């Protein structure tokens, strides 16, 4: 609100720091949905990340109560995972002219995952009440309904092959044979790209400080629950600093 306690339309621009948190919500192993296949990959379980993003709002100040529509875009989250698992399949002692030779056969499995998660945008409508402590200092609280758009994708490749290591005895270097059973090699590729739109709810609190007629400095916090994204739940905590101008 402006310094003159008047009413009128306003615009607001904020820079927000968002803490983004995804938690798992899998079907009960003994429940009715135990066989349900997840469409949000296990890759995205328990993500905790953050982003800095702009937010713009337009609203109307009724002289105590305010309503506003806001729009924000968030940063895309990237992560890569690579793992190798080596399992012994068999070992044999072979007699050679040079002595004993130990051959050990292994199965090598490589797993590469590349994932992205993007809270693309949030369009919200909020109702806010300003507490008029004095002519300059106005704490506020509010509630918000938001329509959020989230995209997530994963590109996973799993390769399995057999190798052989021959140990020739003490003091000699072992010999490594790569890909000894090419006919038994396996390569599994899994790609998933999803887009979800959900209606969520949140709350906000902060303080406005009038610095000039019609111009207010705003420092705020807001929590938003984006809704259930298949087998996960997504929420954000945001701290913001901005300016509001009432016409």
UniProtKB/Swiss-Prot annotation:
GO molecular-function term, one example from the UniProt record: porin activity
Subcellular location: Cell outer membrane
Pfam families: Opacity
Disulfide bridge partners, by residue number: none
Signal sequence segment: 1
Gene Ontology CC: cell outer membrane
Alphabetical UniProt keywords: Cell outer membrane, Membrane, Signal, Transmembrane, Transmembrane beta strand
InterPro entries, A to Z: OMP/PagP_b-brl, Porin_opacity
Protein family per UniProt: Belongs to the opacity porin family.
Its biological purpose: Implicated in a number of adherence functions. OPA proteins are implicated in pathogenesis and are subject to phase variation.
Name of the protein in question: Opacity protein opA52
Organism: Neisseria gonorrhoeae
């Amino acid at each position: 609100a402006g310094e003159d306690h008047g009413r009128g339309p306003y615009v607001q621009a904020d820079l927000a720091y968002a803490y983004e948190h995804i938690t798992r919500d899998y079907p009960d192993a003994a429940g009715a949905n135990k066989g349900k296949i997840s469409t949000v990959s296990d890759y995205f379980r328990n993500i905790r990340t953050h982003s800095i993003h702009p937010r713009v709002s337009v609203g109307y100040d009724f002289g105590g109560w305010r309503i506003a529509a806001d729009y924000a875009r968030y940063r895309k989250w990237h992560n890569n995972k690579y793992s190798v698992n080596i399992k012994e399949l068999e070992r044999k002692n072979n007699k050679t002219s040079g002595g004993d030779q130990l051959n050990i056969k292994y199965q090598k499995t490589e797993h590469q995952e590349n994932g992205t998660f993007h809270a693309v945008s949030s369009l919200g409508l909020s109702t806010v009440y300003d507490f008029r402590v004095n002519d300059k200092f106005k704490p506020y609280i509010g509630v918000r309904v938001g329509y959020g758009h989230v995209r997530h994708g994963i590109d996973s490749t799993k390769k399995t092959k057999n190798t052989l290591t021959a140990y020739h005895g003490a003091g000699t270097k072992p010999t490594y044979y790569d890909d000894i059973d090419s006919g038994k090699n396996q390569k599994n590729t899994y790609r998933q790209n999803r887009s979800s739109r959900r209606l969520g709810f949140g709350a906000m609190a902060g303080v406005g400080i009038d610095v000039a007629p019609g111009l207010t400095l705003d420092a705020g916090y807001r929590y938003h629950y984006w809704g259930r994204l298949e087998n996960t739940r997504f929420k954000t905590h945001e701290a913001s600093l901005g300016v509001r101008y009432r016409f």
